Amino acid sequence: MTDYKATLNLPETAFPMKAGLPQREPETLKFWNDIGLYQKLRAIGGDRPKFVLHDGPPYANGSIHIGHAVNKILKDIIVRSKTLAGYDAPYVPGWDCHGLPIEHKVETTHGKNLPADKTRELCREYAAEQIEGQKADFIRLGVLGEWDNPYKTMAFANEANEIRALAEMVRQDFVFKGLKPVNWCFDCGSALAEAEVEYADKTSPTIDVGFPVADADKLAAAFGLAALDKPAQIVIWTTTPWTIPANQALNVHPEIDYALVDAGDRYLVLAEALVEPCLARYQREGKVVATAKGEALELINFRHPFYERLSPVYLADYVALDAGTGIVHSSPAYGEDDFYTCKRYGMSNDDILSPVQSNGVYVDSLPFFGGQFIWKANPNVVAKLEEVGSLLAHETINHSYMHCWRHKTPLIYRATAQWFVGMDKQPGQGASLRERALEAITQTEFIPGWGQARLHGMIAGRPDWCISRQRNWGVPIPFFLHKASGELHPRTVELMEEVAQRVEKEGIEAWFRLDAAELLGDEAAQYDKISDTLDVWFDSGTTHWHVLRGSHRIGHASGPVADLYLEGSDQHRGWFHSSLLTGCAIDNHAPYRQLLTHGFTVDESGRKMSKSLGNTVVPQTVIDTLGADILRLWVASTDYSGEIAVSQQILQRSADAYRRIRNTTRFLLSNLNGFDPAKDLLPPEEMLALDRWAVDRALLLQREIEEAYREYRFWNVYSKVHNFCVQELGGFYLDIIKDRQYTTGANSVARRSCQTALFHIAEALVRWIAPILAFTAEEVWKFLPGERVESVMLATWYDGLGELPADAALNREYWEQVMAVKAAVNKELENQRAAKAVGGNLQAEVTLYAEDALQASLARLGNELRFVLITSTATLAPLASAPADAVDSEVAGLKLKVVKSAHAKCGRCWHHREDVGQHAAHPELCGRCIENIEGSGEVRHYA
């Protein structure tokens, strides 16, 4: 038998079938670095419209986790897709460097008794080390950015510009000093921002405490009685016995009905609606003697249970009937509502009792409990109340309670002198900050849309922003306060600029080393230089000021506005929130146009990642085993708007999908062997109908893919590309063209038409996958024929795809019909193969019994119908002539019959044809193959 292999155009490419991503990806990283890819993109971006994705800075502490990987990959997909869409899309990664976790790490390693300047020095060194480790991991993910010059909140220039941002807010009168209860962590020794508070279950004691009446006559009159004939107590219920020593008032609701209850040895004042459950809790009998509205009790004095002072009744709308007694005990130093109510009744800051120190220990001078830690003092307070006859009930409750997000320990509200950004404080001109921020939210696009209501609710209900902290490692609040008046120096804004200039040269240490006389001269003796530092959320919240308009100047020409902020959904209360407030305070608008939030990673059962559960996925391990492109494909394939499921099984499914895309790409490349687009590319009018359809289908798909990228629907991009590879290419087009590609003349129109289509599709496909499969796309790019720029990222979306003319005889609808018919034939061929009636498809002959219109439609392909169906023979017949053994199909008006061919198999094309053996020189070949190797070659028109 003659070997005709040399007469075939067999596929050939050096593009490897096995990806070997863990080994090959570092080579691509080196290539990007060697050619200066990021710098080249900036160089060509000058005339392009700008798109700015501003990086929310991860904290410079610890290794990256799977959540970091999701976040950075999403950002990179956007930056790359915008670049391919013709934008100048710089990406400057950043790090959040100040704050307690780093300070805590340094103290753990070096001890807590370090001098403050040494602590700052070691914190700076530690943060720098952490940044280098995280940076290497982010680069390994394939994230394209300005890695040689990232922004760091601890960079001197950024520290200086943060001070300038604060100065601008001071100038606009948003900043004030106040005594207010703030979230306080004993372990941090500092106030916490709202974003640093999380809630967890806590078991707490609950106590019902009676406060003896001091104004008995007024209490009797309030209830319409002439006098009281026995002692009376107003009863409060609380879960914080430790606050009783700081009690200064009692709160009732003005509209609630209160009852005077005869409980035997005393009268009890309780909310009427709660009398029954309260008496049951006290294991007492009692009856209601009289009732009165809460407003009647206003300013009646009761006595503190164990201290010689009075607790007056104040009216407060926040009192509710959902638990307790309907009366709330008020410790203004340890409760926000309590604080504001007492202030409303004229209590001065000096009158507010604050016996709890920053470490959670009562001051030594507090009678009965001095020197005790408050949580440990709870039972002692309860015992004292029982001793004095004021304890009516003592139980425990499990409830949701605020905890420090770092230490996981319970917090308290604690009134301290702090610096605040006022939410409702009217600036010199214009709306309040709350009004500005709420208006800015309406001007911002949220993805997904529910984020708008969430952020709106947080801004609408939030208190003033406490921006001061009592720590060493942070950007200073460079204020001088007058020793006598406590007021800011009248030249504060000017002095802050002088400090900023020093910090720009020496870092924050310049402030802490500063002798006040250097700036104030003879005035220095009259002023205190404060040591407070800024909340780290102010650090990251002002990056739009000190990065976009400062250290990197990548904002739009109109100002430091980013097109997009993209972070996890927790950042509605974090970076999105603080950035909105600073942006609206400084520039009167949000620093972003779009906010995109993604969910958190969970395992395939929806459980949170936890080392104890053993369900964590380490990105570095995935990269080392499967490759970064698999991780990127998993991220892209997931709808990030909700929880993002990940596991080894899920990643393996992504690896399987990757292989399908890679194999399809390899098929395209292998069949472009010997193709030079400069001389072999055919114009559309010379291409076969099926090839024109394939290019048109790619064009329509590219439009959908571009739209999906614009709308950040990357899972749609993934599904469209994957389906195109599996169905339209793998399941239809690529199978059909194999015969023509392999058996027709190497330079025939039939083959060059096919290669032209494959070239166009490959040029488009490599760009479609480039934002997601960054490494693989770069690898593919090197194997594509023709002159091209050195990286796919230096290109833009492919513009060589041609559209089918509207009047094309074989239009889109026609090929949809053909695909349906082919699917029906394939189904019957599978049945026949399963029954062992035929072997391969080319051993089959198919007769299609079709109704007239369908028969006429398919007849337009003539003899080439068999090439579309990939059978040795395809015959059309009227539906009415279908024999009894013809099978129905899912195509209306079509029945099928498949039989095994009786003809010999061609040794070259493998078709079973009646003319095999009729040529003496080539007895193993069909006439078509003989024409292709010795004659002028067969002519194809359609497929």
Curated annotation (Swiss-Prot):
CDD domains, sorted: Anticodon_Ia_Ile_BEm (cd07960), IleRS_core (cd00818)
Enzyme Commission no: 6.1.1.5
Swiss-Prot/TrEMBL keywords: Aminoacyl-tRNA synthetase, ATP-binding, Cytoplasm, Ligase, Metal-binding, Nucleotide-binding, Protein biosynthesis, Zinc
Known catalytic reactions: tRNA(Ile) + L-isoleucine + ATP = L-isoleucyl-tRNA(Ile) + AMP + diphosphate
Keyword Aminoacyl-tRNA synthetase (UniProt): yes
Binding site for L-isoleucyl-5'-AMP: 567
Pfam families: Anticodon_1 (PF08264), tRNA-synt_1 (PF00133), zf-FPG_IleRS (PF06827)
Domain of life: Bacteria
InterPro entries in the cross-refs: aa-tRNA-synth_I_CS (IPR001412), aa-tRNA-synth_Ia (IPR002300), Anticodon_Ile_BEm (IPR033708), Ile-tRNA-ligase (IPR002301), Ile-tRNA-ligase_type1 (IPR023585), Ile-tRNA_ligase (IPR050081), M/V/L/I-tRNA-synth_anticd-bd (IPR013155), Rossmann-like_a/b/a_fold (IPR014729)
GO cellular component: cytosol
Annotated ATP binding sites: 611
Gene3D superfamilies: 1.10.730.20, HUPs, Ile-tRNA synthetase CP2 domain-like
Entry note about domains: IleRS has two distinct active sites: one for aminoacylation and one for editing. The misactivated valine is translocated from the active site to the editing site, which sterically excludes the correctly activated isoleucine. The single editing site contains two valyl binding pockets, one specific for each substrate (Val-AMP or Val-tRNA(Ile)).
UniProt-recorded name of the protein: Isoleucine--tRNA ligase
